[in-house]
């Protein structure tokens, strides 16, 4: 589980912009992670710039692009990129060891359709991703901020849902997953109130885990212990 931003929101769900809304979490790198950053960053790393990426230039082709916010150590993201070579993948993570681990795994797997940001997710989304350019946005297991007084810090808020909607193509999907039932209820409430989305669940609640989201070791262990995971998928329709 990785916290993608230290941004806070007010009671109405409005993002409280700060001059510096995050601190890049350096952490302690293993030799392998440090080496992966040094050797793989020139080809897979994306240096933040407040101008929209040209995805065709970045990937050298036209293809649907999937963006993941807060990929943790990156194992699932690398697996997804490996299993869908016809798609482009962009990952955003503030935790440097996670970035190093992701790059190491991607290099070992021979993945060429993955690019990575070591930066604040909100800044990347607002300034570096063009509107209407993404086929899917993924937010898996974000910090649940389970204490009620901290709920306003949850990343899924009204303004965030609108930001994601703008970045998706018509027909693009915002896919969320959480192992906190209360957060899934919060996500559902926010997304049902958001304009321009349609819930892909037949009964208007959650969906079964789709094939494109790998089952993590943590999640498999949770299943054996009877813990739940909730997936929500909302399509941009306007």
UniProtKB/Swiss-Prot annotation:
Catalytic activity as recorded in UniProt: guanosine(46) in tRNA + S-adenosyl-L-methionine = N(7)-methylguanosine(46) in tRNA + S-adenosyl-L-homocysteine
Provenance organism: Shewanella sp. (strain ANA-3)
Residues the record marks as active site: 143
SUPFAM superfamilies: S-adenosyl-L-methionine-dependent methyltransferases
GO cellular component, one term: tRNA methyltransferase complex
Function: Catalyzes the formation of N(7)-methylguanine at position 46 (m7G46) in tRNA.
Originating gene: trmB
TM region(s), chain numbering: none
InterPro entries reported in the protein's UniProt record: SAM-dependent_MTases_sf (IPR029063), tRNA_(Gua-N-7)_MeTrfase_Trmb (IPR003358), tRNA_methyltr_TrmB_bact (IPR055361)
Keyword RNA-binding set for record: no
Binding site for substrate: 147, 179, 216-219
Keywords linked to the UniProt accession: Methyltransferase, S-adenosyl-L-methionine, Transferase, tRNA processing
Keyword tRNA processing: yes
GO MF, one annotated term: tRNA (guanine(46)-N7)-methyltransferase activity
Protein known as: tRNA (guanine-N(7)-)-methyltransferase
E.C. code: 2.1.1.33
One Pfam family matching this protein: Methyltransf_4
Binding-site residues, S-adenosyl-L-methionine: 68, 93, 120, 143
Sequence similarity: Belongs to the class I-like SAM-binding methyltransferase superfamily. TrmB family.
Pathway: tRNA modification; N(7)-methylguanine-tRNA biosynthesis
